[in-house]
C-alpha cells in the first residue's frame, strides 16, 4: 500500500512503500531550508538534483549530488539546504 506524505506546507512530498519487508519513501523537495527528525536509521540517496546537509552532531555541511547517499542515525535530526527541486530515495535501515 502506498502512503502519501506532505511536509513544510507542501514543499516536500513523498510516497512511502514496502518491498519484501523493507520500508522506503521516494519524494521531491522544493528549494528551501528544512529540518527532519529521524525515528529509525535511514539512508538518503539523491536521485536528481543536490542536497546540502548538516547532521545533528556535526558542525560542517556536506553536499550530495545525483547518485550519492548519506546515512542518518535513528533518534537524531538533520538540516537540509535545497537550492533547486531535488528528488530523493529514503531507505529505512531498521
From Swiss-Prot:
Its EC number is 2.4.2.1, 2.4.2.2. CDD domains: cupin_PpnP-like. One of its GO terms (cellular component) is cytosol. It catalyses: a purine D-ribonucleoside + phosphate = a purine nucleobase + alpha-D-ribose 1-phosphate; adenosine + phosphate = alpha-D-ribose 1-phosphate + adenine; cytidine + phosphate = cytosine + alpha-D-ribose 1-phosphate; guanosine + phosphate = alpha-D-ribose 1-phosphate + guanine. InterPro entries: Ppnp (IPR009664), RmlC-like_jellyroll (IPR014710), RmlC_Cupin_sf (IPR011051). The keyword Manganese does not apply. HAMAP family: Nucleos_phosphorylase_PpnP (MF_01537). This is Pyrimidine/purine nucleoside phosphorylase. It comes from Aeromonas salmonicida (strain A449).
